[in-house]
Amino acid sequence: MNTVFPDSVIAAFIAKMQKKKVIYYGHSTMEDFKNSFIGSNLAAPIFKKWICFCYNLGDVVVTPTEYSRKLLEGYGLKRKIYSITNGVDTEFFKPDPEGRIRFRAKYQLTEEQKVVISVGHLIGRKGILDFLELARMMPKVQFIWFGGGNESLVTAEIKEAISKKPDNVLFAGFVKSDELRDAYCGADVFSFMSYEETEGIVVLEALACEIPTIVRNIPVYEGWLEDEKQVYKAETIKEFQEKITAIFSRDVRLMKKEERKIACNKSLGKVGEQLLRLYFEME
């Protein structure tokens, strides 16, 4: 079961009636539900109870990281919890010089123009407000945000901030996977300012494409992403500005190799091997 929607719950009950083992994927937590849309903070405690009910329908629970595993253990789940990465398609997401050309042509960017991108829904948790403030602090840099969301669920604060965005910010909306890959290959920095993640699939995609990446220094990255080895980490908007400025002038070739190495260790093939071992354990 891969979602916490009612159809997955029904499917889990049917599987149990048929004496089948159920693996429930624990991608959602109360922590990453908060600050997501209008009313999400009020609904968060109810959401926590619901996902606990869902996850306990599984014989085991699989969650992407050690961080999310510890969160779910703290919920008092009755099932054994395994941490297995979401993984990334490293055959698709990989460095591509032609992708850089396509990206810059599409958005009418010169080869010399510095470009910072981010990817995510237009929600507070993803750091959209900080992204806009960062752009104001770096007016000579082009900032592009990929992703959108249901406009009726976007908070008034974010709508107002977007309406007053600085001129160097472009909201590209949702794009196809190949266009997003071109963006990873064509921009200078991937700035992921999210406050809470269970892993961050877009981070894996960025690492696979070897774009210099800066993330917020939050617990989910502990143990697998090191500051100034595979990524840069920052806490304040000022730190993001300073480190991005430094990236523009640094030789990042060694870091790119480390990025790709991390991504390859989380390739879909590696994920498949881990899942296969789990399946055999359950027999």
Give the predicted meaning of each segment.
Residues 174-175, 182-187:
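Short alpha-helical donor nucleotide-sugar binding micro-motif in glycosyltransferases
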